[in-house]
Amino acid sequence: MCHGANSAFVELSHHGGITAGSAMVPCPWFPEIADLAARDDLLDLGVHLTLNAEKAHYRWRPVSGLGASSGLVDAEGYLWHRVADTRANAHPEAVETEWRAQIDTALAAGIDVTHLDAHMGSALGPEWCDRYINVGIDYDIPVLITRALSMYGPNNHLADVTDVDFERFVAQAEAAGMPVFDEVLETNFSRPRGEPTTYETMLTASDVLAHDLVFCAFHPNAPGPGEIEVIEPDTWHVRTDEHALFGTDEWLAFLEAQPLELTTMRELRAEYRTATARQR
């Protein structure tokens, strides 16, 4: 999303505190992470398919160049602030065109795209979730999806969609041989400044440990000054606290001590491609 997020991703990937990340192609700082990823085979980077520009003053437009008639943009020509507005206005064909433009841009920049996931969960909207999966199939890249929408952490923008509504998309992903996650955990952006983090408790909860495949959608960001602190004046500390925690040897020791097997999206992509190649 920004320089601090790019810096944190590269630093923590090399430290071992995280195993994968995803880039927001429409954002102004995308060229930086594209350049870094193209020159660093260690970095496991997907595309964070983006249909919204939710910040007050740090905003972005469609990569495809589509305008008002597409329903993708607000009156100022930016992607909508709210997922609800995107769902109410965007034409599914335009959404797919924009996704493909973002993926094509990432590939052309030299990124070895390991997976596709959804900024603010918007790609999982029932208006176009089938297209989300089909785009992944077309590019031979797995998409992030859970067995139940209620187990997808960033689902607050899809509150009207039930698990029953979502079943057909899960079936579609499974039929395509996609890895389907049991749960997606997300950063707690409501944590007040000064309160201790709870990541250790989150990752060792009994229901989490009982799952086979869990995705952690965290948002570490290196401190500015004057970047993330201005972009997110109310929640910047959550991101910088993640950066500080995940960069410690204590965090690595904690992960090593748990009954967890860390994997990468590149490994899951390889398994997916091997399985689909056998079916051809």
PLM region descriptions:
Residues 3-27:
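A short alpha/beta connector and helix-capping loop motif
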Residues 9-15, 30-44, 61-74, 107-108, ...:
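Acidic (Asp/Glu)-rich catalytic clusters
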Residues 58-88, 229-234:
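Active-site gating loops and adjacent loop-to-helix segments of metal-dependent hydrolytic enzymes
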Residues 92-93, 97-174, 179, 192-197:
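Catalytic domains of cell-wall/extracellular-matrix polysaccharide-remodeling enzymes
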